[in-house]
């Protein structure tokens, strides 16, 4: 569909740079857009409210979708099965966003194949992932596997036992937190391997960018903190993203036959 250059919009000052990148790729477009792994709506509601895109959301987490439905009752959202096919027909969408989702799934190739199926010819995939770099060992999503007792202690101290149980003990939806059951490593990608993975599944990267270097040092404290301290730490993350490009990878890729 038609596209014009877009500014970062409502995410220009957001500490997570992936949203500004995705906004720039998508906000000037029209047609049907799917935010795959939309969560409870950090990105999709803004895109739905401020652009001409016909937005759809999909996620396997029922709690996230319930929160998103309350927030945007007019936004069509669908619950996915972790190990199932996408519940959409062939060439159903003109663009798909996959923002820090690919690293959570057990079979990346299968998911990319499904995205290729539901995108129309020449459709746009906007993809963000963590990039493998010097500080990848600090990835907090791997703490639950490497240090399970410490992870449980810290998480329950901050959010409570019930929230921990709902997020990590109950795997009835094939999820452990945001990670698919059967996946025991939050993948951090090298640029050549991600580009090759995309090309192997019918996507040609057009834009590759990145952000951050030291943000992992601030991310966990920011997740656990609140109020002014959290705002300060998120400001550090934002500034880190302004200066460095090594820790996250952002890709806009076209579907090819």
Q: Where does each model-flagged region fall?
A:
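A short SAM/SAH-binding and catalytic strip from SAM-dependent methyltransferases
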Residues: 97-106
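Conserved N-terminal segment of class I S-adenosyl-L-methionine
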Residues: 1-89, 95-97, 112, 179, ...
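Short, cationic motifs built from Arg/Lys/His that form the positively charged side of catalytic pockets
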Residues: 117-120
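C-terminal beta-strand of the catalytic ATP-binding
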Residues: 253-257
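S-adenosyl-L-methionine-dependent methyltransferase catalytic module, highlighting the catalytic core
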Residues: 7-14, 106-114, 124-252
């Amino acid at each position: 569909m038609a596209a014009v250059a877009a500014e970062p919009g409502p995410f220009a000052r957001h500490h997570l740079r992936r949203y500004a990148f995705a906004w720039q790729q998508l906000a000037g477009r029209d047609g049907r857009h799917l935010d795959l792994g939309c969560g409870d709506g950090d990105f999709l509601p803004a895109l739905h409210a401020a652009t001409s895109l016909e937005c759809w959301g999909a996620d396997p987490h029922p709690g996230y979708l319930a929160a998103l439905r309350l927030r945007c009752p007019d936004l069509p959202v669908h619950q996915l099965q972790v190990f199932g096919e996408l519940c959409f027909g062939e060439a159903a969408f003109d663009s798909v966003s996959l923002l820090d989702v690919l690293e959570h799934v057990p079979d990346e190739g299968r998911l990319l194949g499904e995205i290729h199926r539901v995108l129309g010819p020449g459709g746009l995939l906007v993809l963000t992932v963590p990039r493998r770099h010097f500080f990848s060992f600090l990835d907090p999503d791997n703490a639950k596997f490497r240090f399970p007792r410490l992870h449980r202690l810290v998480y329950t101290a901050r959010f409570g036992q019930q929230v921990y149980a709902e997020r990590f003990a109950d795997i009835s939806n094939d999820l452990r937190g945001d990670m698919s059951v059967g996946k025991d490593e939050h993948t951090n990608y090298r640029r050549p391997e991600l580009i090759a993975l995309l090309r192997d599944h019918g996507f040609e990267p057009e834009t590759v960018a990145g952000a951050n270097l030291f943000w992992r040092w601030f991310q966990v404290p920011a997740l656990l903190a609140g109020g002014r301290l959290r705002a300060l730490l998120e400001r550090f993350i934002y500034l880190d993203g302004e200066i460095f490009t090594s820790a996250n990878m952002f890709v806009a890729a076209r579907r090819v036959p």
